[in-house]
Amino acid sequence: MLTKTQAIVLHAIKYGETRLIVDMFTRAHGRLSFIVSLPKSPKSKVKKQYFQPLTMLEIEADVRPKVQLQKIRDVRLAEPFSTIPFDPNKLSISLFVAEFLYHALRGEQQNVPLFDYVASSILWLDAQQASFANFHLVFLMRMSRFLGFYPNLDNYVSGDYFDLRESMFLPTPPAHREFLQPQEAEKVQLMMRMDYSTMHLFQMSHAERNRLLEVALVYYRLHLPDFPELKSVSVLQELYKER
């Protein structure tokens, strides 16, 4: 079926001399893999740089059920970035987010609210001039709402523990080891209440930010089967070291 849809590039790998296999999250069909031919002519509409992580595209594709690699008929940039490719901090964050989405969205079917959340988040990061050091933390924590394991924050009481396995705040620690002590549980519930416009109010040290990232990734590994250790984490953890 010939389909026109918005798409976000998650990952691309070279396949032979002139082709790429590109994983995308599409608004119309969810997660799909495409085989893309790269013409040698510089005048071609299809450019290799279109398939950098998190690039937002408008594609026309022949989408067929049960086909592993779909074919793209036409492609253009939907939202050209103005800062992400040129800002080292934003670029590091975007590469982490792309790797995270590549694993978190495996098998994801059409989910328009989730697509819109991811797209609007990327555009926010691109437009922001400052105060985005906590972006990746808020992005991960709020995305759990769309994947079905966002905790009920209304039940939180100061001094509660946070059960990572059951996504619950509790007055006493659970019987297993996957939980946070009250001090860290309080920080997590604060971050989950924040959005991009208010997250700058949450002041953290470099060590605290990295610890919350570690907690968020443990949380995802508990709830998403086969969610791996992410290679880009080490680079992300070096950001804002002086802060």
What are these regions (language model features)?
Residues 1-21, 25-243:
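Non-catalytic alpha-helical scaffolds and adjoining flexible linkers that form interface surfaces
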